[in-house]
């Protein structure tokens, strides 16, 4: 029996971010590739993380080149289904709108896998509203969490939505992990140094903790971006008197990155907006309690009061206007810094949830099931 042909149009590294990592997992999946006749086009135009979401003439030429590459692949492969990981808002959405509409004109059956959110923030703009109506018409949608349906419900029926959370491969040195008990607890920030990740609010929270006499070591792992330069970051640390308890290590990958997880006691991610960050899953795998903003689909991973603490209230926040409160961050961190038993309990709860729901094996089986259903629609 002939396998169904699927053309995967998705982001793969470089640059390295959540969506590109998941794209690479799909590309390398033995189960997915053995279940279908798979063909791939890398949707990424930016090769540097700081260029993601930016415009410019050079980027525009890259978009046109990518559009022609997609068109050529469709004509050559003649797929039964096209899987694409487009953007939901802003300049990247306008670029992907053209690609999706071209696929529809070419008569393709399309399933879109959203690794981001933002539709609700733009749906009241007349142009975006018009584009969204055409963008979502006649397609199926894969979301990272049930909570994210709120972002697209104006345009997509619930029966046309599938949920497939992010996942990560098992890390050998996280197996049989023991929860850390550093004499001075280490708080791990492992994402890029960006204002939209809540870096300033987090630094303010650390200042509050230090002023209260709390003992901690804050480790920062991640790349610098145009949102915050190295000089600006250093200046903020100096201004708040945090140089003695904060260390910046730059971006780390592979075993170098995992060593920071294995040495940490608490993981923090006070972002303004997220969909379903892979870094939270990595923290859960290493049995770290998580303090994170309750934005997007974060609550699908972190259970408030069970495997960590959610910032901003009990209900998932979809709008990008959210800003974390430094005092709330400080309060949640102080609870974990002073209660070793609670850190252990929450960390192990997160680890157990990771093993049940977020391993790569679970993801692959779920993705094969979703793709099989969509090939038939």
List PLM regions with ranges.
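Donor nucleotide-sugar binding/catalytic pocket of nucleotide-sugar-dependent glycosyltransferases
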Residues: 133-175
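A short, well-ordered alpha-helix in the C-terminal region of glycosyltransferases
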Residues: 328, 335, 342-356
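Glycosyltransferase donor-sugar binding loop
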Residues: 40-46, 190, 217-232, 250-251
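Short hydrophobic beta-strand element within catalytic cores of glycosyltransferases
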Residues: 289-292, 302
